[in-house]
Amino acid sequence: MRHTVIFASAFATLVTASAFAADLPGKGITVQPIQSTISEETFQTLLVSRALEKLGYTVNKPSEVDYNVGYTSIASGDATFTAVNWQPLHDDMYAAAGGDNKFYREGVFVSGAAQGYLIDKKTAEQYNITNIAQLKDPKIAKIFDTNGDGKADMMGCSPGWGCEAVINHQNKAFDLQKTVEVSHGNYAAMMADTITRFKEGKPVLYYTWTPYWVSDVMKPGKDVVWLQVPFSSLPGEQKNIDTKLPNGANYGFPVNTMHIVANKAWAEKNPAAAKLFAIMKLPLADINAQNAMMHAGKSSEADVQGHVDGWINAHQQQFDGWVKEALAAQK
């Protein structure tokens, strides 16, 4: 008799679970996430994927492509969403791929993302360098010369990223072309060289952003300092943005927010997923902490999945709340 009760109870649980699965809005629908080739973006992308799975969606592994390709893929419906839409940094790419006519973007996923130019603190203090405009002086520029041509060598970013257009625009706007050579290439490889130079006690000049592990290795304020710019100057869709802060400081880039962007037609047919995209929030500090773990060697696919598990376990109530609110939007 006891076995019969256990079996009946297990069967009832199974039936309830199956019925619940059948009621889930994502049943039978496959989702294709997309991100850039920056592996540190996987954590926040997978967090969204996990929440979608709780809504019943089948979620593929994220595709890694250049941002431009990512936006056009989402606009055409070849991909479903990205969790790394930087605003306003990606505004030109977003607009070029169709803007609000093609994309669904509601809510703010991550707040307070900063970016800009930095130099090592030792050189900054030795030569009293606080502003990138000081690099117009050939004597100052030569301090950062790494290849013997007399110009400062600035580490830029990977071709096709939003920062590439801004850096090139500002190099011209601030009249630095004669004294500063910007290198754009594989960001991770260039950064490895920059960190090696820094550890050797040599001057460094580079672009970076937060959240990212670089600022955990070369800490702003302790090891390196942010450089200000002479005035606000941004290209394209960002051209009217004043980057000056309330305290008068100007680091050349506005503080960015990150958003989950999805194909608009898909979002309209999937209100539960659309609601989820609008309400999910991830603290910048949590991304920094996870990125630092990756840089310390915990960067395999299994490691990153483990980091996602850990975050959800530590924020289970919040995570379940997102899923519950998203499910309610379907009704």
Swiss-Prot record:
Cell compartment(s), UniProt: Periplasm
Disulfide bonds: C157-C163
GO cellular component, one term: periplasmic space
Residues binding substrate, per UniProt: W86, H90, W161, G162, C163
Signal peptide per UniProt: 1-21
Keyword entries, A-Z: Amino-acid transport, Disulfide bond, Periplasm, Signal, Transport
A GO molecular-function annotation: transmembrane transporter activity
GO biological process: amino acid transport
Induction (UniProt): Induced in response to increased extracellular osmolarity, this is the third gene of the proU operon (proV-proW-proX). Osmoregulation requires curved DNA downstream of the transcription start site in proV, which is repressed when bound by H-NS. H-NS may act indirectly to influence the local topology of the promoter.
InterPro entries to which the protein is assigned, alphabetical: ABC_Gly_betaine_transp_sub-bd
Subunit-level organization: The complex is composed of two ATP-binding proteins (ProV), two transmembrane proteins (ProW) and a solute-binding protein (ProX).
Function: Part of the ProU ABC transporter complex involved in glycine betaine and proline betaine uptake. Binds glycine betaine and proline betaine with high affinity.
Protein name: Glycine betaine/proline betaine-binding periplasmic protein
Organism: Salmonella typhimurium (strain LT2 / SGSC1412 / ATCC 700720)
